[in-house]
Amino acid sequence: TLLTPWLLEWYGPHVAFGVPGVLMAIATLMFWLGRNEYIHVPPGGLAFLREVFSRDGLLTILRLSLVYLCIAVFWALFDQTSSAWVLQAEDMNLRWLGIDWLPSQIQVLNPILVMVMIPLFQFLIYPLLSRVVRLTPLRKIGIGLFVMAAGFGLSAMVQGWIDGGTRPSVAWQFLAYVVITAAEIMVSITGLEFSYSQAPKTMKSVIMAVWLLSVSLGNYVTAVVNHWIQVPGINAVVARAADLEPTPEGIETTLADWELRVADLVPRADWRTQQDDATVREIRLSGPDGRFATADDILLSFNRFGGLTGVVTPDDEPLAAAKEKIDAAFFVSADNDAAKEIPADEAGDALVAGIVDSSGRPVRYQRITRDRYRLTTDGPDGQPFTGDDVVLQATAVRADPEEAARLADKPLSWREKRLIELKGEEGRREVEAARGEAPKTRIDGATTVGGLATLEGADYYWFWTGCMLAAAVAFVPIAVFYRGRPHLQDDPTVA
């Protein structure tokens, strides 16, 4: 967890994923070498099926499945530490304890905290809690679910600060990791032990499989929610742009619900001879009217690598006018570039008031982070959060002499070198900007169509916090009315 992000940053994916592959091969070899030292339980045959489908076996699966449904929500939140929390860390101050952390490296705290906190729980926290209430496995799990809600609620608060234009320290994520690791100890470790003890002798492996199914279910729920909140857009067309064949004059094709026409400005055989920023292909998308060469068309331009170089929409002019007003407010907000602020939502709305899109509807403004904001129009269909929304994403690139001086002696990482190699001078400017070496502070803008999310920012985190809290409350009656009995591995009364 600590080494892989560092290897990826400095040596590239070949080494970053090759090293874990070699280590896994060594681990597999060690496992194989000890094959004669393990206990081998012979297949149970029909006795296994009889116990699984017996009244006791079916009731055990049913009772534990109710427990696992609530725990699945725990996993839906916990496994987002490797996705949503990494994205959150990108907008935080990553210099902590004198170290420049990579966003994905903060995950290393979890296994370290697990090793530190297990003895703490075993010898201090559990004995103290036992003086107040009798701690059963189900009560530990229930407490852990509420603690998980608190941990994710903390991350929601942090995201709220980010949405408000601040750049909090990544130390706040450390605190959140402490909380959710405590929840993991009470839910995951206790849940595994409880599941094993509740499973009849021949069903230990089956119950472990059902336990792992709850992990899978939690991740599936996360995937479904993230798919559900995603608004379609032109990304599906952009991803396939280089693979599409040119369409004959007056003929269109369909891709991801878009009617489109593909035209090569340069024969494909000559693409490699063109400059990196030269437009070699154009794709025209028809708007809601379903016709081409009308006011609601969208024109996409691509370079020889299939990279998107330009987007022309009916709302480019009002969006540019709105961006000009927001940018002006940013530059006059402070003398020091590091202190300049993107306007808050209310102030931004006031600045763009009166600017309307091609259909006469107002342009919407939203501050995303300290350095990013978004301008949106409803597009030709007049409906928000649809695939026709025209979106201008703006990013402030700050000149930061102090940061540039601090990183002056730091060599270029593999990722930075690769970025320069792939994008040329544009990539070099991106690397210099990230190091604070931009000649002057500027605000870059990029236009796209669709692709918004109906749930984002702090609202996204609060949604999952609410789900976890609801699951924790639902678990209380399950724990109260749960009736099961432990089955020991060497229980002579169990067939």
Residue ranges and their predicted role:
Residues 248-442:
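Low-complexity, acidic interaction segments enriched in glycine
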